[in-house]
């Protein structure tokens, strides 16, 4: 088996039985905020696109690159389709001309039979509202000699099926770096922002190392990030200095952490690097550049590399911005009322979970999303808000023009906004913004309405707690860490006060906990 990095979470997996192109992203995403790092625009995308199978893990725009898929990927390729609760991924791929779909069942091994041989594959589908745009997934591929687990940026909660269905995993590709807007966009004191950033930077790497320990693969490829920020107003987000609060550490930083914790087998790959495996044996690792130049991209030459990359991509960035809607136009109150109020009326669990009005400051306009009243309105004089966003009007007008069903997958991941809040993170609020269609909101609201099993118990540091995390049902025997009277689930970094089970991260999500 040959595994070639095509950038970010993208890989070409080549076997005697056929090739699988995974998450081929090259064009800037999220209002031209994110670019692949290192640069992958020089790869031969026409050749890469002549694949037998296509796997797109989910619809986030750093995985689903519609322009690249349309222009370069063989439309007769068989699409390996995750078992998602809504059909959006299949629908979007069909719009691009793909017509051959292999529908998988969540966490079930399937055999792909082709003219050149057979492959065993399994797609672990994640279906919680917090998983991607209503769906994220991870892919296992076995060719009879070698088994690869491409986890990209998915966060599976139960990996026992890997060993039961495939035995030993030979190579594991996974995310370890940041892919979020927190804490950078929030209005808070610099000292607090630095503390939260440093905490997040470390927790996301701790989570990745826990996954590595669980999977137990011989070889590990850190991937699926970080992105590169080339717009002048966003360049400070790159981890090209020595800021311990930067949430976007690169592969070299994580490989050092792996080694420091006794985890060997980490492989550094850049776009165009190819690793050849036979079972647990790494036959070769070839890079498009000498090894010392590859490492320098992440170390001594990183700032200069990003500066040169920004110069090369300046025309691309300008062309992207030219495609945005104009900032000026008709008042936005009525278009936003037309968009949001029907969704509010279908989502009692989510609106009640949000629990308060939210302010949208869009240029000169202030618009209130009054979730308790299921209404979009103007503010009341001297009204104060627990949560608010300041978003440039051209971004809002663009997503309205394009009928975007997901503001997380467009505006929020761009980091081109400001936010403020009183109290903790509100998961229901961001879920609302990613569910702006009837199908999505119906699924998400129903998901929150279901009762989750908390009957099984474990003991951690002298506390008896429910085994499954109240947030997304992670196994707390694997992801739970107790410090004093605080439990942290490292899957998403949520915390609970063990004295009374109160969630310290968001409303609701009560934990059952006691001293035995």
UniProtKB/Swiss-Prot annotation:
Oxidoreductase listed as a keyword: yes
Enzyme class: oxidoreductase
Residue sites binding [2Fe-2S] cluster per the record: 469, 471, 489, 492
Disulfide bridge positions per record: none
This enzyme's EC code(s): 1.-.-.-
Cofactor binding summary note: Binds 1 [2Fe-2S] cluster per subunit.
Cofactor section: [2Fe-2S] cluster
Matching InterPro entries: RibonucZ/Hydroxyglut_hydro, Rieske_2Fe-2S, Rieske_2Fe-2S_sf
Miscellaneous comment as given in the Swiss-Prot or TrEMBL entry: Was identified as a high-confidence drug target.
Listed name of the protein: Putative Rieske 2Fe-2S iron-sulfur protein Rv3818
């Amino acid at each position: 088996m040959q595994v070639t990095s095509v950038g970010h979470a993208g890989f070409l997996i080549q076997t005697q039985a056929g090739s699988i192109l995974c998450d081929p992203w090259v064009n800037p995403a999220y209002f031209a905020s994110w670019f692949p790092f290192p640069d992958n625009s020089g790869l031969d995308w026409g050749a890469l696109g002549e694949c037998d199978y296509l796997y797109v893990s989910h619809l986030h725009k750093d995985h689903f690159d519609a322009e690249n898929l349309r222009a370069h990927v063989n439309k007769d390729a068989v699409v390996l389709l995750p078992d998602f609760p809504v059909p959006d991924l299949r629908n979007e791929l069909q719009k691009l001309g793909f017509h051959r779909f292999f529908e998988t069942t969540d966490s079930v091994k399937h055999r792909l039979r082709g003219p050149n041989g057979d492959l065993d594959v399994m797609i672990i589908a994640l279906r919680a509202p917090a998983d991607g745009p209503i769906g994220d997934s991870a892919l296992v591929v076995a060719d009879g000699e070698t088994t690869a687990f491409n986890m990209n940026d998915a966060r599976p909660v139960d990996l026992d099926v890997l060993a039961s269905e495939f035995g030993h995993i030979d190579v594991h590709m996974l995310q370890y770096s940041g892919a979020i807007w927190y804490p950078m966009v929030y209005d808070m004191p610099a000292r607090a922002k630095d503390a939260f950033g440093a905490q997040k930077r470390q927790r996301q790497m701790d989570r990745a190392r826990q996954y590595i320990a669980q999977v137990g693969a011989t070889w590990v490829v850190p991937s699926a990030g970080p992105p590169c920020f080339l717009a002048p107003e966003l360049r400070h987000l790159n981890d090209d200095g020595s800021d311990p609060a930067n949430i976007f550490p690169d592969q070299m930083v994580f490989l050092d952490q792996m080694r420091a914790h006794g985890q060997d087998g980490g492989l550094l790959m850049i776009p165009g690097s190819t690793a050849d495996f036979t079972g647990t044996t790494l036959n070769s690792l070839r890079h498009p550049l000498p090894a010392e130049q590859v490492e320098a991209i992440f170390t001594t030459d990183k700032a200069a590399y990003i500066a040169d990359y920004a110069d090369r991509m300046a025309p691309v960035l300008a062309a992207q911005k030219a495609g945005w809607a104009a900032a000026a136009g008709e008042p936005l109150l009525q278009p936003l009322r037309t968009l949001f109020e029907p969704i509010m009326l279908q989502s009692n669990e989510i609106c009640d979970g949000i629990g308060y009005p939210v302010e949208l400051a869009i240029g000169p306009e202030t618009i209130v999303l009054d979730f308790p009243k299921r209404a979009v309105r103007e503010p009341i004089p001297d009204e104060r808000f627990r949560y608010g966003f300041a978003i440039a009007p051209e971004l809002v007008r663009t997503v309205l023009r394009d009928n975007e069903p997901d503001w997380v997958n467009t505006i929020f991941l761009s980091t081109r906004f400001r936010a403020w809040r009183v109290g903790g993170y509100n998961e229901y609020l961001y879920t609302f913004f990613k569910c702006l269609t009837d199908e999505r909101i119906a699924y998400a609201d129903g998901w929150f309405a279901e009762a989750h099993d908390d009957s099984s118990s474990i003991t951690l540091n002298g506390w008896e707690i429910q085994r499954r995390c109240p947030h997304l049902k992670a196994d707390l025997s694997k992801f739970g860490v107790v410090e004093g009277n605080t439990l942290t689930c490292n899957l998403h970094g949520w915390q609970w006060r063990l004295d009374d089970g109160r969630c310290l991260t968001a409303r609701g999500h009560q934990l059952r906990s006691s001293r035995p």
